[in-house]
Amino acid sequence: MSATPHTQVHWEENTARPCRKCKWQTPDPTDPLRGQCTVNRHAMGGVWKRWIRDVEHMTCSRHEEGELSFRDHV
């Protein structure tokens, strides 16, 4: 099963929903403009990480603002 185009992280100029504000984004400790998206899971429940090249201009349909809770990790 592959991700649909709407769930793919994509470039959107001047987006109101940047990855930087999304609870599923984990910042890169060495480069603040990059990060990882952890919203996708595979069939066994494991996290499928995606690299984000630019957290200010990238977005997807699964964007959620807020903080990631402990329950979201398990």
From Swiss-Prot:
Catalyzed reactions per annotation: toluene + fumarate = 2-benzylsuccinate
Domain of life assignment: Bacteria
GO-annotated molecular function: benzylsuccinate synthase activity
Notes on activation and inhibition: Activated by the benzylsuccinate synthase activating enzyme BssD. Rapidly inactivated by oxygen.
Record GO biological process: toluene catabolic process
Pathway assigned in UniProt: Xenobiotic degradation; toluene degradation
Noted pH dependence of activity: Optimum pH is 8.0.
Matching Pfam families: BssB_TutG
Root EC class: lyase
Keywords, ordered alphabetically: Aromatic hydrocarbons catabolism, Lyase
Induction: Induced by toluene, probably via the TdiR/TdiS two-component regulatory system.
Annotated EC: 4.1.99.11
Membrane-spanning segments: none
Function: Catalyzes the addition of fumarate to the methyl group of toluene, leading to the formation of benzylsuccinate.
Subunit structure: Heterohexamer composed of 2 alpha subunits, 2 beta subunits and 2 gamma subunits.
Name this protein carries in UniProt: Benzylsuccinate synthase beta subunit
Gene label: bssB
